[in-house]
Amino acid sequence: MKSAIVALALALALPAAAQSPVVTVKESPRWGSFQVSLSLFSPDIDSEFTNAVHPPYATIFGTGRPLMVQAQFNKSVWITEYGTLDIGVGAGFWEAWGQGYYQGTDGTVIRGGSTSLMIIPVQAQVGYRFEWFYERFNVPLEPYVRGALLDYIWSTSGQSGVSSWTSPLDGVSYRGSGATFGWSATLGLAIVLDAFDTSLSRQMDYDVGINRTLLFFDFTRSSVNDFGSTKSWQLAPSYWAWSAGLQFVF
């Protein structure tokens, strides 16, 4: 009797199971990405004052590295099973505060009022993210490379606004603001956070269209002196600058 009841239950369950649809969840189509990053930054302005007893940048602003904040927006132009090629634009903000000075007749440094140097880095970039490890083996690591053309918009300010100076020799006025061009090359590694919580990843994709979230770390080498002009400051760091941030792929 028990065998007959079990057989009947199985017979009733099989049609229902056969009719149950199998749902396959796929990522939404990719369009591009948005990222934000933080880095410690210090321009190499003093590189042209190698013999100076009091190099101007270090004397005024010190040897610290204030925080630079940057954001980038990318369009994915080529997506394959191996990786993604992106083109995009970016901008950021950086500012250092210090105390102005002038040199007395006896050579001593005399401190003046507070002053600042502000830089707004603007860039156009192209990058490639190698996604094969994650796509093929589910290893949540994506190395990437990026190259960029840079435009650093800068200004120096004192207590009364943007700094200006008139030469006593020829009467020419100089204003403490301008734009300097350059380039950068970046090597980095991104961690695919979706691999650690796939259900949350699918929900974010369904709700807002973000189909991948990356935590990245990279190192950048750059030069910002109007491509070697002797009339321009070197506004890039003298070292490989690190940065870290989040990238949202949508």
Language-model regions, residue ranges each:
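Extracellular/periplasm-exposed beta-strand and loop segments of Gram-negative cell-envelope proteins
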Residues: 43-65, 94-122, 153-183, 224-236
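Hydrophobic, lipid-facing positions within transmembrane beta-strands of outer-membrane proteins
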Residues: 32-34, 65-71, 120-126, 143, ...
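Short loop/turn motifs that connect adjacent beta-strands in outer-membrane beta-barrel proteins
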Residues: 20-32, 76-85, 131-141, 194-213
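Short glycine/proline- and aromatic-enriched beta-strand/turn motifs that initiate or cap beta-hairpins
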Residues: 18-78, 227-236, 247
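Predominantly the C-terminal beta-signal and adjacent terminal strand-loop region
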Residues: 190-250
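Gram-negative (and chloroplast) outer-membrane scaffold detector with strong preference
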Residues: 69-159
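Outer-membrane beta-barrel pore domains and translocons
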Residues: 39-41, 90-94, 148-152, 190, ...
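Cleavable N-terminal export/targeting peptides
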Residues: 1-29
